[in-house]
């Protein structure tokens, strides 16, 4: 089946705005303030999309961040929105940066999109300075065994990669990350779903529009698989252990 990048669909930005995720900037703000990030720190936005968080950080904290994303369409919008920022085309499993390049890495509803999460986590660890911070906001499955049915879906969305939180925590700690915060934020996902239903009439209609191409798996089937997993949303803040390895 032909894959469909739901993030390039107009209906996604219509309902989520430029952030393309639940909660807008609420968790971005919380992560930045918890980690005491300042304008002196080097920041990477992993899966920057249209550059929403990079613009937010600059406008509210005078912070300059680097963004990386595989979508040239979204990067084009990002460069228009934030002309002074640096944006690169790429994926998380091969970050084009030297070791110890950043103090803070953001992955806001993007880690679930990575083709190889294990390799991406190793790359994040590599480019982070010792003691550097890794902030993740993303979707997870309360019934992770059901999530395997989504992996082969051609609909490119974070929902395709719902996390198993226990596995994610183990992967991070095995790499020498210390998990400082793990907070359930499923209310933000519910809030977004209510907004979608109000605007589109149902989640089925929304996913059918987001899937777009007729050669894609129908949004209705995709939504049925999502419901079986009982999705939630979380904030996790980790720190690279300077004594690891």
In which residue ranges do the predicted regions lie?
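Conserved alpha-helix/loop element of class I SAM-dependent methyltransferases that forms part
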Residues: 21-39
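A short SAM/SAH-binding and catalytic strip from SAM-dependent methyltransferases
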Residues: 104-116
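A short glycine-rich, Lys/Arg-flanked "PGG" loop and its adjoining helix->strand segment in the class I
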Residues: 118-133
